Amino acid sequence: MSEHKKSSKIIGIDLGTTNSCVSVMEGGQAKVITSSEGTRTTPSIVAFKGSETLVGIPAKRQAVTNPEKTLASTKRFIGRKYSEVESEIKTVPYKVTSGSNGDAVFQVEGKQYTPEEIGAHILMKMKETAEAYLGETITEAVITVPAYFNDSQRASTKDAGRIAGLDVKRIIPEPTAAALAYGIDKAGDKKIAVFDLGGGTFDISILEIGDGVFEVLSTNGDTHLGGDDFDEVIIKWMIEEFQKQEGIDLGKDNMALQRLKDAAEKAKIELSGMSSTEINQPFITMDANGPKHLTLTLTRAHFEKLASNLIERTKAPCIKALADAKLSASDIDDVLLVGGMSRMPAVQEIVKDIFGKEPNKGVNPDEVVAIGAAIQGGVLGGEVKDVLLLDVIPLSLGIETLGGVMTPLVERNTTIPTQKKQIFSTAADNQPAVTIVVLQGERPMAKDNKEIGRFDLTDIPPAPRGHPQIEVTFDIDANGILHVSAKDAASGREQKIRIEASSGLKEDEIQRMIRDAEQNKEEDKKRREASDVRNEADSMIFRAEKAINDYKANIPESLVKEIEERVEKVRSALKEDASTEKIKEASEELSRHMQKIGEAMQSQSASAAPSSAANAQGGPNINTEDLKKHSFSTKPPAGNSTSASSNNENIEEADVEIVDKPND
């Protein structure tokens, strides 16, 4: 396959909990790119099946029969400690354990995978989708994250991009991306709220937009609330109902649980447009009396009752976001709905209650975030002019000071990029060193906030307590990722760190994963080529047998025998699971003999030409041009899988004509 030239495009990727989407700027417009499966979004699912790694739709298709090795909703674990994901672990069929640094990692067949690695597989799929469409190699991307993702989660998402072979030019919040897509062609000043209820997280952002400036005024949310939780209440209800009917607990059967998960997701979607839905799962389990079937009716009203607590949880973050923006609901001009769960009528109703107006349903909640990311990519690449994005940090950042107190340096909803400095001192006489503990959160005591990093400033000259002047600087870049430094004024000694996050990957781990991803890419390519060769060989057997059947009476018996022998050689090579090279050799040999059919037919046609009587007496009316086309198309691809695919298309067209024309 010829190498693509490097693209100047910066693609936009919405790396979602349930589905992912990729978009690119073309002719001044953001375009969502359709996947190789023909869909505009791709399931954020990775599965391991033997030596294969499946991503997207193929992974989703086999989830029911392979639940422990199918990793879905992994975004809920990225950048998090094992101790932080207790509720999420209960909802997935695969094994989640604690990694060497306490991070949540996935255990599949004795091997550990980090959420960053799994995210990288999905990002690679998005990258390949864009490359197939553009015909160019993509190296740069803007990736979106929930607005309420903390520093660890943002840094880990960026690491996933690096593992996927992408230079992540910017990490931007999903609601901000949605606002970009909505407001890029709007005139006048507006204050908007973006209500984003996705598969794994909930965000609310308040923005002011006008004259190409998109300023985030405040953001809030809940990273433990999303569509998965709505699925879970339906699953729990189905398990309870089935136990009442049959006395069997389906919650202990992983395969049944995966089927219930699929059924719950389908029912949830249907209830957005219908008042009730039938849930049918035949042969869901069996007991001593035989197979058992699950048949239930779920009404929209009952679903809303089951999910009422989840819906109610969206209210408080909205009220806080309005208060932080110093606005009332009446100040909001428009409310955008983003994320698949925003289609639920009860969710739309609570949005109407909070903001006092009908939400705007004019954007596609599944695609608008990727479109906004592509627009931001266009801004960074110089393709989109006169757009300025002013984002904020979602949570306060500070350090631990005397008495275990959290002292904020950067308050939540501060516009980024930003730099803040503050002078601190020692707590004891002649203190030689200080430990800077970096915290993120809103609680007054350090222990109640999330520690995202720590480092020591040593060799402080002896001095009474309170005398040393230690300047602590917090520098936050446009991605919302933090850099911290501490400098002793007396000695000039300075120590600084980029907060990699206490949850996150070290540089050597990232490099190893990049190498693994590249190696897997090569192995996947080899597997694909082997599959193409086998498919071509199988197809050639069919065409050879068909040609013999169609033209046996018009070609020498010796040639028929030779072709039949070559067919058996190819068939044996396939059955014996021979190497790709051996199958290719056998196929090429069969191809050479297949061409002799065309030559024999041409020769016979030429010798029969002087006599028209043959045709009058019922001789075969054969179009030799079709035979030429047929024999030429059977030549195996002289190279890679791309040409194999191309040849297959020609073969199918030729076959259609050959079947019809001898009977004309």
Curated annotation (Swiss-Prot):
Residues 600-617 have a biased composition (Low complexity). The keyword ATP-binding applies. The modification Phosphothreonine is found at T201. Residues 574-664 are annotated as: Disordered. Pfam families: HSP70. Induction: By stress conditions e.g. heat shock. PROSITE patterns: HSP70_1, HSP70_2, HSP70_3. GO terms for molecular function: ATP binding; ATP-dependent protein folding chaperone; unfolded protein binding. It comes from the Bacteria. Residues 574-592 have a biased composition (Basic and acidic residues). Residues 639-649 have a biased composition (Polar residues). Keywords: ATP-binding, Chaperone, Nucleotide-binding, Phosphoprotein, Stress response. PANTHER family: HEAT SHOCK PROTEIN 70KDA. NCBIfam families: PRK00290.1, prok_dnaK. Acts as a chaperone. Belongs to the heat shock protein 70 family. This is Chaperone protein DnaK. It comes from Chlamydia felis (strain Fe/C-56). The gene is dnaK.
